[in-house]
Amino acid sequence: MSEKSPPRTILQMLGAVGEAQVQQAVRLAAQSLAQLGAAWVLEVSHMGYLFGLFDALGVPENARPGLLEKLREKNAHELRRAAQAAGLDAAGAAALTGLLELSGSCEETLAKAESACRNDRMRAAAAELRALAKTLEASGGAVRLDLSLAGEMEYYNGLVFQGYLQGLPRPLLKGGRYDLLMQKFTPGAGAIGFAVYLDELDRLSAPTPPVQRNSTDRVMLNVALPKGRLGDRMYDLLARIGYGCTEDYNATRKLVVENPAAGIRYFLVKPSDVAIYVEHGAADVGIVGKDILTEASADVYELLDTGLGRCRMCVAAPADYKDDPSRPVRVATKFVNIAKSYYASIGRDIDIIKLNGSIELAPILGLSDVIVDIVETGTTLRENGLRVVTEFMPISARFIANKASYQFKHNEMDAMLEALRKTLQEETK
């Protein structure tokens, strides 16, 4: 049975689509948001600017979808690695990660974007954004340019935009120009439109939980911290840069601790649940291992690799193991999605055996050929007669953010991130 599409209202302009139609569609998107909520943000980007930069840097076609994915995640550290893997030099990788800095108010961001143009395609996109910004000056809410906002490259070819209402955990409105799709049906035709996702509106009527009602006018950042050593370590770091609480964090049995004067509220949650709390907007930001984040495929921004808790995801097997390509590999793991993705990337058929603990026992008892698991020192593997066959994913603690919260609390998040980066850098000197 196919998955049902969420209920939505759609506006489309098809056929002869020019500058006037594009501006009208985006104005209607802004007006729709204004009718639905008092506090709103319309985030705008342009695929032509991104494609123009890809062209200027000589990015291979097959590498572009992966780079766009890292841009959408605001994942600077992995974007840099992916750019280098695509053959870009350090300057090219820096140009791509520089797109993440092209975010903010229209005037300030446009000035930076225009000065960074390298070819006519980028200049044409910047000019279209400049004209659009002028028409939206009196729109009321907040129109932000964010040139890391990227649509699917086989679908969108021009402006792309998303709309947020305060209090909703994900975009309420999504749209853009999609001539490429339209021309599959009508050669030469253009198309622009947007959808408003009606199921999200139901959340606006839900009452705010008492624990999240602010006792001060100061904006509060809600932080999901994992219980255990990683959470304790992160709290100590955040407390050192001004985000501590008056009560003893290490002694309390409370699951919520806060300091309104510092604008901070912590939720203490199971490590595997951090990404869920952040994705669904119960927390604005959180600290989570890359293994958990990848396994859950959480739709969040990955803003910082803290470097804490470093280890790696590996394929391990008995010392005498030899792969038999004539049959699927039997893989024991608790990271089912990660294992499937890795083996799909190398074109190998597998049979998954999901386990929840003592993964090393599976090949010893003949339950599996190999395991996919986290390896830190390798001691447990060696003590059980296993060896690492392949290391395929570095793991560490990542600072993640809810996409909607980022629109309304980006100043507070950026301040925390800047202070945290400095502290982490000082510790590694």
What do the predicted segments below correspond to?
Residues 1-38, 82-216:
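Positively charged, Gly/Ser-enriched RNA/tRNA-binding surfaces
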Residues 50-141, 376, 385-387, 409-428:
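Long, charged alpha-helical interface segments
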Residues 14, 28-39, 56-60, 70, ...:
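Mid-sequence acidic-hydrophobic segments that form the walls
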Residues 11-20, 39-41, 66-70, 116-123, ...:
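Flexible, glycine/proline-enriched loop segments at strand-loop-helix junctions
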Residues 216-429:
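Domain-level signature for soluble enzymes in the chorismate/prephenate branch of the shikimate pathway
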Residues 42, 145-147, 268, 352:
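A structural preference for short, hydrophobic beta-strand core positions in alpha/beta folds
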Residues 6-10, 39-41, 158-160, 191-193, ...:
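Broad gene-expression machinery/nucleic-acid interaction feature
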Residues 5-9, 45-52:
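Short, conserved phosphate-binding/catalytic loop or strand-edge motifs used
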